[in-house]
A protein has these predicted regions:
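Broad hydrophobic/π-residue packing in well-ordered secondary structure
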Residues: 11-13, 45, 83-86
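Amphipathic, alpha-helical segments enriched in basic
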Residues: 8-10, 20, 51, 58, ...
Length: 116
């Protein structure tokens, strides 16, 4: 198992299917992990030539469960998509692939449900 694969085992299950890790920082006080949503359109939008990537939302910081006595901060951002036809900019509501039994803080759930 690669180190990067092993690291995902300590984060909420299914997160690696939605995000890619872009930065990791360990300090004396905490672990900070930056995650960007993977660029993936819904099946419906994939067939729509008017939907194009429009960058990312601002990072939202969520405190996850501690590891080895240090708080873990996940700095996550979602993709922004632009519908050229309607001029609407949107983000998808995200759902973890295996939500049942996954323990998430209210802050974490709010990030996934926010359509930004």
């Amino acid at each position: 198992m690669k180190t990067s694969d092993a690291f995902w085992q300590f984060l909420p299950e299914g997160l690696n299917e939605l995000f890619e890790m872009v930065r990791f920082e360990k300090t004396d006080q905490s672990y900070d992990i930056w995650l960007d949503e993977k660029k993936k359109l819904s099946d419906e939008d994939y067939r729509n030539p008017n939907i194009v990537a429009r960058g990312y939302t601002d990072y939202v910081t969520v405190q996850d469960y501690p590891m080895r006595g240090r708080p873990v901060y996940l700095h996550m951002r979602k993709n922004k998509w632009w519908d050229k036809k309607t001029n609407e900019i949107f983000s998808y509501t995200l759902e973890l692939p295996n939500e049942e039994g996954t323990r998430l803080s209210a802050e974490f759930v709010a990030f996934f449900k926010d359509e930004g």
